[in-house]
Amino acid sequence: MHLKTKVTLFAIGWLVLISAAHAYLNVNWAAVLNDYQPVEKRKITVAYLPVTCQLTCPVTDYISKYSTSGEEFMPRMFQGFPEIKEALISNRVQAAFIVAPLALALKAQGVPIKVVYLGHRYGSAVVVQKNGPIKTFADMRGKTVAIPSRFSDERLLLFRAMKVWGIKPGEIRMVEMAPPDVPGALAAHAIDAFAMGEPFPSQAEIGGFGRVLFQAREYWPDYMSCILVVRQDLIDKRPDVVQVLVDGIARSGLWLDTSKPHREDAADFVGRFYYNQKPGLLRWALTKPMDRVTYSPLAPRKADFDMVRDLMIETGVLNKKLEFSEYTDTRFSDNASMQTSWKYEPGIATAK
């Protein structure tokens, strides 16, 4: 065999090997195989971000693998809300954890979705540079603050605080930024502050470059941010699957609120297997203190959503007065109210 032929064959073999390795390591084969299942047997795909406001999504997926019911859905992590929005519209995901104002905005635009459950209460904060010039909210005038989306509860939270301090809308510059990017931006002094959900406020605290100016509950009692939405076609065709999803999320919320060991265990397996974050960071966010973010009860309430809607209209991101019944389906949360916590002891499967 000539040298040229040997080199060519070697190159082809190497290319095949690299391609195979890439496919093995980077292709989600479970998702690929799921797409070939009959529609009525496919597991639904649920979108989420690596934030504690959406912790019940990976917790439900992880614990259900060790329960008698088995895996209930396929979680898919994204890095920002714009990507989730597009995936939801195109039916690449059938359910998603998104911020409440975005859900209302999508519904107003005609996107066929319904809110079926909340993701949490509390868990967001405004963080400033630790040794920076901002000592009180009054010092925010003229400063740049990162928010996850113009359709976010964090943006509305800032407006509520601005009202209290007599700050006009144009006096604070708000910029949209993917949540995982904000700690680095604050550390690099690219922004003066950020309003985000955990664990990013905790990351700034642990890193020594950020200080929590205030928690969301200080300006917004019973604060909520992330909620669970489901496409209408899934509700119409497979309501039983939607109920199983909501039941699982409800059980995870109760499980997380049961004890500190439960939260510490969740910090370990979610940090390692889902969020790609240090478990110590999540432990800080989930336990210092325990009510920094809560996960029960999480049934959608009309008063909460009416307030979000009215704030959106007031701040110019919604031009339609949607009624609660137009964008929610509460039968699933009503049924889930009878659920109990997962019977799962911390540490049972974490080491596997």
Go through the PLM ranges and name each one.
Residues 310-352:
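Conserved C-terminal helix/tail region of periplasmic/extracytoplasmic solute-binding proteins
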Residues 101-102, 132, 180-275:
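Pocket-lining segment of extracytoplasmic ligand-binding domains
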Residues 8-24:
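Hydrophobic membrane-insertion alpha-helices, especially the h-region
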Residues 78-82, 97, 148, 152-153, ...:
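Soluble non-cytosolic domains of exported or imported proteins
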Residues 236-320:
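Secondary-structure end/capping motifs
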Residues 1-5:
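Short, Lys/Arg-rich N-terminal segment immediately upstream of the first membrane anchor
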Residues 55, 86, 90, 104, ...:
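Solvent-exposed, polar/charged alpha-helical surfaces in well-ordered, non-transmembrane soluble domains
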Residues 23-168, 173-176, 192-198, 209-214, ...:
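Short, glycine-/small- and polar/acidic-enriched structural segments
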